[in-house]
Amino acid sequence: MVKTQRVVITPGEPAGIGPDLVVQLAQREWPVELVVCADATLLTNRAAMLGLPLTLRPYSPNSPAQPQTAGTLTLLPVALRAPVTAGQLAVENGHYVVETLARACDGCLNGEFAALITGPVHKGVINDAGIPFTGHTEFFEERSQAKKVVMMLATEELRVALATTHLPLRDIADAITPALLHEVIAILHHDLRTKFGIAEPRILVCGLNPHAGEGGHMGTEEIDTIIPVLNELRAQGMKLNGPLPADTLFQPKYLDNADAVLAMYHDQGLPVLKYQGFGRGVNITLGLPFIRTSVDHGTALELAGRGKADVGSFITALNLAIKMIVNTQ
C-alpha cells in the first residue's frame, strides 16, 4: 500500500452483535486506520461486557492516517438517541443507525475514507422509527446518486452478483429487461477489473427459468431477453458464458473457469454461496463511487454482549476492502 488509508466502519444495530464484532476487530493490528462511526459509550460498555481492552482515539481528519494498533479504535462520534440494552431493540435508535450510515457514506464521497464496511442493521426497527429503509445497498445508491448499483456476495471461492435484489418472485420476470441486464453486466465487468484487479473478467450467467427455459418450452425470457443481451456484450469483447441452468451451473467444470456468477434473482444464487461459506461471506456493493463491503449475517440480538458472536465475516469484509483499496491505487 502506497500510504496508510482510513477505512470507516458502521457497527449497525446497537442492540445487536455489531458493536461486539467491532470491539473484536480492535483486538488485532491493521494496516489501515479503523474509523468507527458510533457512540463512544456503546463501544466501551460492550468492550467491558466482553472483557476486552479498548481505547478510543479521537478522529482527526487533518492528521495523516496511522495503522491501527491492537486494542484501539479511532472514534467518529455519533450519539445514541436512547440507552442501549444488549439484545433489546429501541425504536428511537433507528435514527442513530441511519445517522451513522449517512456520515460514513458522506465521508467516502468527500474522500475522507478509502472504504466503508458495514455491520448488520435491523430493517424493521428503522422502518418503525418512520424512516423508509429497504437495505444498505439501496440507501447508499440513493445517497451517492449512483446511476445503478449491483449487489454481490463473495467467499474466497465464489462470487455471486444479482440482476435483481429484494423483489417478490412474481415481479422478477418483468424486471429483467435488456436495459437492466446491460447495466448490471457492465457494472459487474467494470468493478471486477477496477476493484478486483481482474484484467479480463469471465462471467457465468444464470438463466431465469428452469433448465434456462428449455429452448422456450419453460419460459421465453432467455430467448427474448437474456441471449440477445449476452450476444451484444460478447461482440464488445466481454467473456460471458450462458445463460446456463442454475441447478447445474454451480459445479467445478463451470466455476473453475469463471471469476463471477450473475444470478437473475436473490434466492437463485445466494443459497449456494451461503451454504458453501456461511459466516465467511462478504456483501459488496458494486457501482458505487467508493468501496463498500459488509458482513453477510444479521443482528443476532440473542448473542449481543455474550462474547459468542463470530467475527469471521467482519474480518473477511475488512480484508477484502483492503485488497480492493490496493487494486484501485
From Swiss-Prot:
The keyword Metal-binding applies. Gene3D superfamilies: Isopropylmalate Dehydrogenase. GO terms for biological process: pyridoxal phosphate biosynthetic process; pyridoxine biosynthetic process. Its EC number is 1.1.1.262. A divalent metal cation binds at residues 166, 211, 266. It catalyses: 4-(phosphooxy)-L-threonine + NAD(+) = 3-amino-2-oxopropyl phosphate + CO2 + NADH. Binds 1 divalent metal cation per subunit. Can use ions such as Zn(2+), Mg(2+) or Co(2+). Its cofactor is Zn(2+); Mg(2+); Co(2+). Coiled coil: none annotated. It is found in: Cytoplasm. Pathway: Cofactor biosynthesis; pyridoxine 5'-phosphate biosynthesis; pyridoxine 5'-phosphate from D-erythrose 4-phosphate: step 4/5. Substrate binds at residues 136-137, 274, 283, 292. Keywords: Cobalt, Cytoplasm, Magnesium, Metal-binding, NAD, NADP, Oxidoreductase, Pyridoxine biosynthesis, Zinc. One of its GO terms (molecular function) is magnesium ion binding. InterPro entries: PdxA, PdxA_fam. Its main location: cytoplasm. The active site is located at the dimer interface. According to PubMed:15026039, PdxA may catalyze both oxidation and decarboxylation reactions that directly lead to AHAP. Homodimer. Belongs to the PdxA family. Catalyzes the NAD(P)-dependent oxidation of 4-(phosphooxy)-L-threonine (HTP) into 2-amino-3-oxo-4-(phosphooxy)butyric acid which spontaneously decarboxylates to form 3-amino-2-oxopropyl phosphate (AHAP). This is 4-hydroxythreonine-4-phosphate dehydrogenase. The gene is pdxA.
